[in-house]
């Protein structure tokens, strides 16, 4: 498609969706990279997860997708079941090197053989120093050439893949992923790889986001929002679709998530020994609120299309959700 036609299509979708044109362009890049990832030789070992899956796969939130979270099957590195601290350290290194070398190499080759070739640069996250020599999860940055001259502060022309092997992969389902351009203007075909994408179930993502907020708000780790307010928005929007009803009472799924986090991604200061649902904390402490409010306002203007509930409404929703968790045995 000629450049002027690309601009015209993106601007048309931006008008319809009430989103910045740069957001529509980035969604197209995010979608294309997801499709390419699940057409790679290593695709069978990957699972698409996180907040982006809620919009791209399940249509549960009206939040523009910014990054791509991928879980890597630990079996690739010959690790299964519960691991010792020593094994986890080895797994983190193996996973980090896999992303830096293998995933980066395969993705770079796929881009070279796709219509995206010549329009972006693929850069792996560099090694760190000391204990952070091998970051895990590790990032791959895809820096693309925007067809628009003006930029937005909250949106950069970069797609971020974050991949690691410490994630809980199941349950998942295979789905197809499309762009906002294709769903808004069905006559336009923008698919770069016709693939199915193994994607975490929404109920699992719901519970993981709730657990993450508890880990942030029950410790000092949530003092600065740092682009995390989207988790509150995501939970609130999923509540409007009724996801919480089945998720909160799914004892088997919750227990698998809590057990997994206690071993592989535990946060210092968080008690994993008893059912966290009984005391889960989903509302930021008063001293955290200003940071989270500012982060949400910044994010909402650039990344939310459709309903944009105010921050107070989100917090009210989290209070309701807290009570539902605390009373899960009575449901």
Residue ranges of model-derived segments:
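Structured mid-to-C-terminal alpha-helical surface segments
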Residues: 1-46, 56-62, 68, 74-331
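Glycine-rich beta-strand-to-loop/alpha-helix junction loops that act as flexible
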Residues: 48-52
């Amino acid at each position: 498609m000629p450049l002027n036609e690309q601009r015209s299509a993106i601007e048309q979708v931006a008008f319809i969706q009430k989103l910045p044109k740069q957001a529509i362009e980035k969604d197209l890049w995010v979608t294309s990279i997801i499709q390419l990832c699940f057409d790679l030789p290593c695709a069978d070992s990957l699972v698409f997860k996180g907040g982006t899956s809620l919009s791209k796969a399940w249509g549960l939130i009206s939040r523009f997708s910014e990054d791509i979270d991928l879980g890597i099957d630990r079996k690739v590195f010959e690790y299964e079941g519960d691991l010792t601290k020593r094994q986890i350290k080895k797994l983190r290194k193996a996973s980090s090197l896999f992303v830096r070398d293998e995933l980066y190499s395969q993705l770079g080759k796929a881009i070279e053989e796709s219509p995206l070739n010549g329009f972006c640069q693929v850069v792996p996250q560099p090694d760190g120093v000391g204990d952070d020599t091998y970051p895990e999860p590790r990032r791959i940055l895809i820096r693309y050439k925007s067809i628009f001259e003006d930029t937005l502060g909250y949106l950069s022309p970069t797609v971020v893949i974050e991949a690691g092997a410490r994630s809980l992969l199941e349950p998942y389902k295979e789905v197809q992923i499309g762009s906002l351009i294709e769903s808004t203007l069905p006559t336009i075909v923008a698919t770069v790889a016709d693939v199915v994408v193994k994607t975490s179930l929404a109920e699992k993502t719901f519970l993981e986001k709730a657990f993450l907020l508890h880990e942030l708000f029950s410790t000092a780790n949530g003092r600065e929002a740092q682009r995390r307010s989207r988790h509150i928005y995501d939970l609130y929007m999923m509540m409007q679709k009724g996801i919480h009803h089945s998720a909160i009472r799914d004892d088997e799924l919750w227990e698998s998530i809590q057990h997994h986090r206690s071993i592989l991604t535990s946060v210092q200061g968080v008690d994993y020994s008893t059912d966290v649902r009984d005391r889960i904390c989903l509302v930021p402490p008063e001293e955290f609120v200003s940071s989270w409010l500012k982060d949400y306002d910044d994010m909402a203007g650039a990344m939310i299309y459709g309903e944009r509930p105010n921050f107070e409404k989100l917090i009210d929703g989290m209070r309701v959700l807290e009570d539902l968790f605390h009373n899960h045995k009575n449901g």
